[in-house]
Amino acid sequence: LDAFETSVRRTSRRLAEAERAEVLRWMGVLTKSGEATLAGMYAMGRFPQGWRPSLGITAAVRLSAGGERRTHDLVHLTGPLPELLEQATAWAARNIPADMGYDAAGNGIDLPALPPRAIREVIANALVHRNLDAVTESKRVEIRIVRNRFIVTSPGGLVGVSLRQLGDPDGKSAVNATLYEICKHLRTEDGQRVIEGEGGGIREAQHAMAAAGLPAPVFRDVGLRFTAILQWGREPAEGLERGR
């Protein structure tokens, strides 16, 4: 909370001079009566899922049909948004395969099949921009690994922006404006910002995939859910189109 307050105070003279309770109210963390808002609980609460169980992540590796098991490493992640981001990226790191590569000295090293930056950005995007309305109250962010695809699905579709605009400098729109503003001032345990606050997460994922020589991310919006797909391997998986 101290780090959040310090970051917020740097943005405005009025906020710099306000009491802590005022800062939290003006930033939408607390209501006027001092209770946590939904955005505040989700972003900064100790256990948001105790209030709304859907404010979590379900992740699993989907196995090939015909086997005894349908999934591997099925987890239900809980905690405030920054912790969800850390847990989900760690889960991805242990389940996405690595390729053999070499460092500048010629030493053999393991290189992840997908750029970690792209993985982190699509997860952060799903967490920050998921719909929080009652219609999606029973829906979690879902992460799946299916063959050579990393799939992240969040409740709710795009608002104020089209699929074609994703990644464009002017193609940004916060589904949850209050949550977005809160997250601009939050960091994970390793000191990284949850979001940069410039709407560049999708663009960063696109650049990371291109730099790795991989297919562009694929995005799908069907109104009730938004899906981002990252694929490793040179050829697009069957039934997929490359993103723009």
Predicted features and spans:
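Active-site helix-to-loop segments that bind/position phosphate- or nucleotide-bearing substrates
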Residues: 1-154, 159-173, 192, 201
